[in-house]
Amino acid sequence: MSTVTITDLARENVRNLTPYQSARRLGGNGDVWLNANEYPTAVEFQLTQQTLNRYPECQPKAVIDNYAQYAGVKPEQVLVSRGADEGIELLIRAFCEPGKDAILYCPPTYGMYSVSAETIGVECRTVPTLENWQLDLQGISDKLDGVKVVYVCSPNNPTGQLINPQDFRTLLELTRGKAIVVADEAYIEFCPQASLAGWLAEYPHLAILRTLSKAFALAGLRCGFTLANEDVINLLMKVIAPYPLSTPVADIAAQALSPQGILAMRERVVQIIAEREYLIGALKEIPCVEQVFDSETNYILARFKASSAVFKSLWDQGIILRDQNKQPSLSGCLRITVGTREESQRVIDALRAEQV
């Protein structure tokens, strides 16, 4: 009689999964962490809620109301979750039948769309972006049959550019009555004029993902938002955990979304954009850098000569970047988070010293 192992008991698709290689999971012993698009310095908050003996609200009113006001939408159009990553997963769980429906995304882009779908057992379809990383609308149209959710990251991670708004409109028309279009706006605070939040009234099948991890400098909080019309939010409420936000997280999130918190965030954005432009200018002068791409975010994508050697050399010096070589069309590319001036200088000095 054959022995059944624990692994044999697992679902087949889970046995075949490769875990998402987050920046933190890839690790390293660095002291200059420029690999996860975090804000470089800690922001301080005091906990005000001393009710840890009670379960929290499922959707804390102060957080929802503050975010709705900030985003210019109604409270009924906001869902808060454990990071935008949970929002990605909730949309698949609510709209996709495993083994029947598919999601679609356009690489090179954020890795969690595929990981979430594969975990749930939902097919992933990809339509690579065009040479300028804009959407291949014809390619998307050809593959839409059976697709229930389309993910588009704008500004796109890791390339840093915005998706053309006219292409978004075309995509929303193509998918009307067929699929949900998810605009991942994790980095929208760095280019707020480009948000699609004002389009919700026009497109009942539009959902928008947001986060407090980037410009709000709260990656450790794990707090994200889905903006969508009430019908979508009501469906997501059926599949979300009963208490997605702990009391301390809700407390800090509400403070971060107060008028003073939003003002502080906007000041951080101004500072990061200034630092980004400084770093872009310096990178363009460095011999081992072949190309620096424009960015609307808090990170810069650049193509290097001997990028793997450069990546390892900086890693060995305690400077941790994000290698993008495995992404379609990004051979030779590394992604650099915009940090402090001191961190920028460490990167610049290390790259200048590279012999290529």
Swiss-Prot record:
Cofactors needed by this protein, per the record, are: pyridoxal 5'-phosphate
Report the residues modified as N6-(pyridoxal phosphate)lysine: K214
**Catalytic activity from the UniProt record:** L-histidinol phosphate + 2-oxoglutarate = 3-(imidazol-4-yl)-2-oxopropyl phosphate + L-glutamate
Biological-process GO terms, alphabetical = L-histidine biosynthetic process
> Which InterPro entries does the record cross-reference, listed alphabetically?
Aminotrans_II_pyridoxalP_BS, Aminotransferase_I/II_large, HisP_aminotrans, PyrdxlP-dep_Trfase, PyrdxlP-dep_Trfase_major, PyrdxlP-dep_Trfase_small
Q: Does the keyword Ion transport apply?
A: no
Recorded hits in Gene3D superfamilies, A to Z, give: Aspartate Aminotransferase, domain 1, Type I PLP-dependent aspartate aminotransferase-like (Major domain)
Top-level taxonomic group: Bacteria
Which EC number(s) are documented for this chain?
2.6.1.9
A Gene Ontology molecular function term for this protein is: histidinol-phosphate transaminase activity
Instruction: Indicate the family of this protein.
Output: Belongs to the class-II pyridoxal-phosphate-dependent aminotransferase family. Histidinol-phosphate aminotransferase subfamily.
What subunit structure does UniProt give?
A: Homodimer.
Task: Show the PANTHER family listed in the entry.
Answer: HISTIDINOL-PHOSPHATE AMINOTRANSFERASE, HISTIDINOL-PHOSPHATE AMINOTRANSFERASE-RELATED
The name this protein carries in UniProt is Histidinol-phosphate aminotransferase
